Amino acid sequence: MKTPRRFPLIALTVAAVLTAAALYWWYSHSTASTVQNRQGTEQQRASNSQGSAKRAGNAPPVQAAEALRQNVPQYLSGLGTVTAANTVTLRSRVDGDLVALHFNEGQEVAAGQLLAEIDPRPYEVALMQAEGQLAKDRATLTNARRDLARYEKLAQTQLVSAQELDTQRARVSETLGTIKADEGSVASARLNLTYSRVTAPIAGRVGLKQVDVGNYVSSGDANGIVVIAQTHPIDLVFSLPESDIASVLSAQKNGKLPVEAWDRNNKNLLTRGTLLSMDNQIDSTTGTVKLKARFDNQDDRLFPNQFVNARLKIGTLEDAIVIPAAALQMGNESHFVWVINGDSTVSKKIVASGLQGSGQVVISAGLQAGEKVVTDGIDRLTDGAQTEIVPAQASTPLPASGASS
């Protein structure tokens, strides 16, 4: 009776043990597979990373440019100051009260234009007096000549002595001299009256007025009435080293030399003109010589006392090899460039450089037209290394270029 009760209990126990064993087997195999997959993924990532690093180390990205053959203008550069072609301090030539000003400060004026008026009344009176004296002496001369004519007739009959006749002749000559002096006085008075109207001696731009209406002015005033500066045309005075004198003199034999005026930062071209003259002596203090260039300045890009950079063109270097200045490097003893070969490797080439400006440099020896030179990414290069050329617009910022020996 007791045997049937034990069989279900044993069966249940065996089933529970088998179920637990099955669950343990499934869990252990599932965990091992997951770990194995993760390890495989990490190994693949590490392999990819090492491969990328290896490729990056073998072929660093660089930017390059081709050496070009072209005509290169030859310039001499110097710092200069803009000066007015002519500068005049307008002064009154006569003394008197300033009654009117006929200009606005900063205005452009023409030669002969009325700019100021001095009280003319004293000079009008002086002119009237001079003219009156002249008229009086002319009447005296007329009367003296009539008396002389009568004396000459009477002398023929000896009714007057020779001495009286000579005296009358002297009186006529004296009156003629007086009239000459009177005519000079009239001319002087008329000129002074004209000077009461002050006109511009040159065309140009007036500055700030130095005196106000109502003040007494004279010809001895140091500041005058206003300063006029001629700015059309306008001049630029700049200096060059004495070593450049021979080049300038030689270039002048071929005609007028063009000059460019650039702003003080040497970035923007202001205007173009021509060389006007060169000083006849060297400044012994600075070892430089002064030159003067002239510009039409119709657009008023230049202003008196403005500091600008002058570029004097003395010739053209024909069929020169030109590369970007960033490609030229300085070694221990010489200049060099990195040249990209046909198999994308780089080689260091010693070169001789010439003129340099506007971001370009002339190579006088060591490089041929058409060769590609590295302009950026130079710090990463070694002789014979592989490179990858990338365009400037698509590349990430590269390390600053530097010389490598």
Swiss-Prot record:
Signal peptide span: 1-22
Covalent S-S links between cysteines: none
Bilayer disposition of the protein: Peripheral membrane protein
Gene Ontology terms for molecular function: efflux transmembrane transporter activity
Compositional bias segments (type: Polar residues): 35-52
UniProt keyword annotations, A-Z: Cell inner membrane, Cell membrane, Membrane, Signal, Transport
Disordered: annotated span: 35-62
A Gene Ontology term for the protein's cellular component: plasma membrane
Compartments where located: Cell inner membrane
GO biological process assignments: response to toxic substance
UniProt main location, coarse: membrane
Complexes and interactors: Part of a tripartite efflux system composed of MdtA, MdtB and MdtC.
Family membership noted in the UniProt record: Belongs to the membrane fusion protein (MFP) (TC 8.A.1) family.
Name of the featured protein: Multidrug resistance protein MdtA
Organism: Erwinia amylovora (strain ATCC 49946 / CCPPB 0273 / Ea273 / 27-3)
